[in-house]
């Protein structure tokens, strides 16, 4: 008699899931086919939850693969302007001599694609493809989008995304913070904006305008009503004049503060959300390098950082690495690491997760074991707590009785 053991009955699916995620980080056609077979087998066995987990891994891997580094070579004849060099002098504020911009050249930009979900990835891929052949578009009397507003919570990777886009276009990035362009000298702010745009329009580059909401903050000052009108008008006029010259990217953490006239100037309005669980796991693994941390540790860090930004996840991983440096992987108490982080960064962790971590350990283990977005196995919980599986099983049973 032949006994068939289903994946569902193994209690090791989280490990299989982690192996699939690691394999799909740089997949071959054969690897992808096997993960797809496993997904289909789970569907056939009537386990849609685990099949959905593998489908998410496949979708996210496809997104990262689509955004893999592939610098575009834009013909000099299709994009006007002179070539920027390291010797090019950036414009400065006439009164204070403060530089109005910083130049980042393509060779200084990391080729590693930022990690986002499938929808954001597809949108970015579409933008880059439209810039791939400007001459082909010109034959149909169309052009790629020349203005893009990227908005979202602080730490979600907006600036990194804009920088990476410039690197993929193989163009220098002229970075200007709008708050630094605003001067206390009457009329100087408008002049600074005009000087910045004149500089960017002269050269083949991507213009990045950071801290866009600083104009709205100035607008709240009743003594600055006249000045802010001049500044906003100068900005709108210069955005209009640049639309036929090159790509302009605006970044803001507070889109609700922007004037509607400013919104209309941007052909693309891209919201960068906080990462979901799958992306948090990918970010945790990326930030963990070069350390090969246990998969259970990485999964827990991703699960506990629900609602966190990429920057906050990176900060937690740094705390984890510091603990490793002092204690080593065999001595690290992962829950203590997270408690330490949650104490120092209490505003970055959800109240629900903090209550679990600082509360009864059995209740935390039960929440992990029954997590809707991918339960933790008894073996994983034992690895997280540093206890044997039988002890963990007793803790789970006690927590169920109490519940």
Segments the model singles out, each with a brief description of its role:
Residues 208-210, 233-237, 246-252:
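Structural recognition of the conserved hydrophobic beta-strand(s) that form the central parallel beta-sheet
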Residues 99-146:
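Pre-Walker A (pre-P-loop) alpha-helix and adjacent loop at the N terminus of AAA/AAA+ ATPase modules
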Residues 173-202, 229:
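Short glycine-rich substrate-engagement loop in P-loop NTPases that contacts/grips substrate
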Residues 260-278:
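A short helix-turn-beta junction within AAA+ P-loop NTPase domains corresponding to the substrate/partner-engaging
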Residues 5-18, 24-30, 40-44, 49-113, ...:
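C-terminal alpha-helical "lid" subdomain
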Residues 220-241, 275:
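Substrate-gripping "pore-loop 1 plus following alpha2 helix"
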Residues 144-175, 195-202:
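Walker A/P-loop
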């Amino acid at each position: 008699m032949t006994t068939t053991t289903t994946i569902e009955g193994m209690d090791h699916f989280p490990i299989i899931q982690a192996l699939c995620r690691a394999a799909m980080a740089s997949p071959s056609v054969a690897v992808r086919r096997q993960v797809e077979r496993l997904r289909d087998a789970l569907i056939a066995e009537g386990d849609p939850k685990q099949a959905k987990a593998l489908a998410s891994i496949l979708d996210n891997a496809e997104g990262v693969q689509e955004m893999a580094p592939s610098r575009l070579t834009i013909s000099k004849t299709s994009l006007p302007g002179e070539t920027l060099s390291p010797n090019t002098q950036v414009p400065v504020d006439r009164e204070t001599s403060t530089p109005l911009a910083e130049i980042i050249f393509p060779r200084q930009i990391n080729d590693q694609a930022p990690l986002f979900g499938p929808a954001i990835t597809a949108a970015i891929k579409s933008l880059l493809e439209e810039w791939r052949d400007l001459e082909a578009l010109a034959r149909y009397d169309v052009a790629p989008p020349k203005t893009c507003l990227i908005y979202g919570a602080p730490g979600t990777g907006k600036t990194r995304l804009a920088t990476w886009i410039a690197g993929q276009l193989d163009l220098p990035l002229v970075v200007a913070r709008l708050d630094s362009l605003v001067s206390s000298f009457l009329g100087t702010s408008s002049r600074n904006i005009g000087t910045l745009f004149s500089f960017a329009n002269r050269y083949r580059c991507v213009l990045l305008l950071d801290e866009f909401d600083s104009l709205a903050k100035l607008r709240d000052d009743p003594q600055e009503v006249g000045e802010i009108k001049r500044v906003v008008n100068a900005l709108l006029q210069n955005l209009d004049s640049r639309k036929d010259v090159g790509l302009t990217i605006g970044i803001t953490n507070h889109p609700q503060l922007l004037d509607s006239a400013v919104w209309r100037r941007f052909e693309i309005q891209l919201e960068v959300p906080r990462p979901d669980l799958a992306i948090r796991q990918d970010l945790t693994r990326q930030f963990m390098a070069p350390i090969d941390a246990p998969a259970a540790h990485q999964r827990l860090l991703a699960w506990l950082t629900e609602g966190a930004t990429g920057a906050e996840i990176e900060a937690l991983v740094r705390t984890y690495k510091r603990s490793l440096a002092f204690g080593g992987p065999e001595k690290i108490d992962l829950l203590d690491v997270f408690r330490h982080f949650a104490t120092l960064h209490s505003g970055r962790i959800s109240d629900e997760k903090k209550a679990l971590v600082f509360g009864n350990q059995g209740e935390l283990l039960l929440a992990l074991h029954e997590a809707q977005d991918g339960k933790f196995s008894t073996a994983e919980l034992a690895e997280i707590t540093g206890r044997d599986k039988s002890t963990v099983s007793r803790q789970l049973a006690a927590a169920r009785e109490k519940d």
